[in-house]
Amino acid sequence: MSLADSDHELVVEELGREPTPAEAALFENLWSEHCAYRSSRPLLSAFESEGEQVVIGPGDDAAVVALPTDGDDDVYITMGIESHNHPSYVDPFDGAATGVGGIVRDTLSMGAYPIALADSLYFGDFDREHSKYLFEGVVEGISHYGNCIGVPTVAGSVDFHDDYEGNPLVNVACVGLTDDERLVTAEAQEPGNKLVLVGNATGRDGLGGASFASEDLAEDAETEDRPAVQVGDPYAEKLLIEANEVLIEEGLIESARDLGAAGLGGASSELVAKGGLGAHIELDRVHQREPNMNALEILLAESQERMCYEVAPENVDRVAEIAEKYDLGCSVIGEVTEGNYVCTFEESEARSASDDSTDERSESGERETVVDVDAYFLGEGAPMNDLPADEPTQPERDLPEIDLETAFEAVLSSPNTASKRWVYRQYDHEVGVRTSVGPGDDAAIVAVREANQGLAISSGAAPNWTDTAPYEGARAIALENATNVAAKGATPLAAVDCLNGGNPEKPDVYGGFTGIVDGLADMCATLETPVVGGNVSLYNDSPSGPIPPTPTLALVGTKDGYEAPPLALEPGAGDLLLVGDRGLESGDVRLGGSEYLAQFDGSDRFPALPEDPQALIETVAAVANDESTLATHDVSHGGLAVSLAEMVTGEAGLEVDIPVPAGTEAGVAGALFHEQPGRVLIQTTDADGVREAFDGVAPVHSLGTPAEDGTLSITVGDLSIDADAAKIREYRSTIAAELG
């Protein structure tokens, strides 16, 4: 990828000369879609990002949100999300691992300590060997890196869809903990302060990673693009986490930026640009892993586990001492100035990682200025794209005729609805001793004892939904994540998004992408949940075609305390109620976007959503926290049949009778398998109290009383089906049975 002719002309006009090779490479990377959001930024104003609890919104390495506490001391969380899609196709292990490392360092940049990770993963058809190879490699990379650095992976999602075959998605979110006194931003503060590079030595790995992520994947990407993929070192990252903690605690950092896309050039120029300042950097002062690196390589390499700090001159020696204590490299590479962003290089003085990085030189030869540009123009000067978009249309109804037994087995055993225990058993989700509710439930709960709050975390998307109806499906994804946290008794606080799309230059693709942006923004605004940050990943396109528009949402909610009602039924107690099923109430059951139709090649319009989603979420959270509530479970992927099956255990079964409203064309399949979000199963000893709570908010249907025989018996109209807990486990073990 090279600088477009129109961009080149704009750069020449601004500089008054031809750019140097290093400048041209910087503009190529920082004006790429990956960094500049040239096709998506015009759409992102749709999101509401402000709120009473929002401290720092979009634009920094991570967002900062204050927890609602009664005490005098403010407790902040940070939220960030990133994609590492192209690298994870080329090298699934390192691509996914370095995605984890990058989002953790974004957390460090804000003066926060990382306390939880959530990953949302998307692959091609599970039956294909290549999809399984990517899946296994990505999960191994995430588990290896996350486990080694001691940050628990507590939530996430996994989806399989044909259109990810040539381009998987790896979206990783991180939550951190900080407070007002520790808070740091990526905005340079003062001319004369030093720029200090701390962490691993710089090599040649990851060169051109930002521009690589801004192009469609080619057929030979797995071999030809391997140099653009970084190699992670989680042990160095762990040391960096702990060193950063000391630096923050001692108040040594004025501002900070993680070295990610475009490496040192990206991090340092963005840091000073946000402060309206410039910098003078001596590239040969950077501690290097490989010999004879030139200026461009040092500037753009995306070697991992590195941080750029702004440090007051009197604190530089102490920063170097701390770096040495944690066996991390440390280079004083330059200083903040009031002028341009300037990088110089003296090849004969280039250092290796073993050189003393803080000593002043006794001699100075003639230096070459390789970059001399306005930092703000470099970071913000890229022109935005005005692209045509085709309005998506929803499919016509074409429902298959499948017997109930076949449909039940197929939907329960689909990799999309099957147990993901094979994935999360590889993650250490209890390290840090904050995890109260771990993976496998609707949402994770992480204890923030500093505020006596439970932090509920849900992350995911639904490619079948947004493939069917981008706008409506994205609205549903926001509601689904909110319902997940509400089912565990939490109230939504804030969210970050990762907006994944194909090649935006294709009008149908850009139309779908526009739909997911607007849909996600509209529902989050309705729920009064600010979207405080995020990431955009476009050009997820390959010879296999574009991916489905995929809006991953990582949403957090808060609750008093750390306990939550379980997902599993309590044997022989109370009543099981279904809350919020508009289809059963009205007879307008739609199967669009369902796993049922994906399994049997049908089509339909997407389901209608609740009329007052905010009231629904507030009421679900309140009921979940009531002492009469014994169990709760969100209903969505796979429909009611899957959610009921997930609640059954060897000790607790259920006999349910589901009425099919007269005139419902979707019939039995619609009742069991439609995927309207905003529905919750509630086991309670106070059924009348639940009905009263939801009066005027959502319909409530009684499904029966949990039994003690471990068998699920479902009657729908004139048809019935039975499956005991062992059979359900067998159906839902698809992934583990295949991968071991």
Where are these regions (language model features)?
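Flexible loop/turn segments at secondary-structure boundaries
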Residues: 33-35, 85-87, 123-126, 160-165, ...
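Catalytic cores of large soluble enzymes that bind and process phosphate-bearing ligands
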Residues: 3, 15-19, 28-35, 56, ...
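A glycine-rich helix N-cap at a beta->alpha junction
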Residues: 134-152, 279-280, 510-537
